[in-house]
């Protein structure tokens, strides 16, 4: 469960290292974001000489959360960190690589480009 002021790791090579959620895209009063939700975030830490800079406001899709993800077949998936992938306005990832495992629920949410870049889909 991601809420405003939550820090997230970046799971791609876009140039950002750490994000802070400032808004959840969707209904005007959504309190929490889960896997597959799009958020507005600010870059808190970035790699030097990268196209993304610190304090830049960007969009990102959440790919891992510490809170459990319950599937219809009864399995539960939990990750060790909160992580997101930086995307543009059309929903395409800004990076060319994605690090770590990605849940298969992203494919049903039309983030197929992120799923195809991922090394492992759970």
Curated annotation (Swiss-Prot):
GO cellular component terms listed in the entry, alphabetical order: chloroplast; cytosolic large ribosomal subunit
Location (main, coarse): plastid
GO biological process: translation
Cited SMART domains: Ribosomal_L14
Keywords: Chloroplast, Plastid, Ribonucleoprotein, Ribosomal protein, RNA-binding, rRNA-binding
Key word Endoplasmic reticulum present: no
Pfam families in alphabetical order: Ribosomal_L14 (PF00238)
InterPro entries: Ribosomal_uL14 (IPR000218), Ribosomal_uL14_bac-type (IPR005745), Ribosomal_uL14_CS (IPR019972), Ribosomal_uL14_sf (IPR036853)
An MF annotation (GO) of this entry: large ribosomal subunit rRNA binding
SUPFAM superfamilies, sorted: Ribosomal protein L14 (SSF50193)
Subcellular location per the Swiss-Prot or TrEMBL entry: Plastid, Chloroplast
Domain of life from the UniProt record: Eukaryota
Gene3D superfamilies hit by this protein: Ribosomal protein L14 (2.40.150.20)
Quaternary structure and interacting proteins, as annotated: Part of the 50S ribosomal subunit.
Function: Binds to 23S rRNA.
Family: Belongs to the universal ribosomal protein uL14 family.
HAMAP family, per database record: Ribosomal_uL14
Record PANTHER family: 50S/60S RIBOSOMAL PROTEIN L14/L23 (PTHR11761), LARGE RIBOSOMAL SUBUNIT PROTEIN UL14M (PTHR11761:SF3)
Descriptive protein name: Large ribosomal subunit protein uL14c
Source organism (scientific name): Arabis hirsuta (Hairy rock-cress)
